[in-house]
Amino acid sequence: LLASGQPLWIYDSPISHKKGMLNPHLMKVYDELFDKAEKAVANDKVLLERVQLSRLPLQYSQLEIARTEAGSDKQKSRELLELFEQRTAQFGVKSLNERNNPPAEYCVLYRKRFLPQNEKSLAAGAKVEWISKPEAKYQTIADEALTDELYGGTTYVESWVGWEGRDAEFILDLGEEKSFSRIETDFLHQLGAWVLLPKSVTYFVSS
């Protein structure tokens, strides 16, 4: 954590640290250490369960980071989610964070939002033209976040784009005429961070 230079906040997310203490190399190291630990106590049920319980935060971090990575191995995520669901139930884990989100609800939501669905977005990869640019803290991901087919998470640092005290206005250029039946937009409501739902939304289409 200290070497990464990334501060750790009280309501933080693993996603904030995926280039720091939770980068791919270190995550691989952590995983290997837990593999060795489980192997070392494989014949002792009590100790094995302690290691498996201690591993849950790492598995949660793996799931959270995987859903923000385009092209990630969805089958691997599905298998890890099933194991995470099984273990949290086995060990009676009641909540995952300060917001008291139950593991069972998290797993249901993860399958619905972050694992492959039959429908594909016609706006995937579309060019974004900003009429009103997002706040500076969102701009590093803004050009991709709206059209990368990845849903945002439960906190504003997890793949969301935001504006403060003004309306959001932008154009999605699909590059060519396309036929579609509906327009959908996803929003975050996080009162603790003063992130609020819009009062209204208006869409315009052109041909």
Model regions and ranges:
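Short, surface-exposed beta-strand/strand-loop-strand elements in extracellular ectodomains
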Residues: 194-206
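Disordered, acidic Ser/Thr/Pro-rich linker "stalks" and the adjacent N-terminal cap
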Residues: 112-180, 188-197
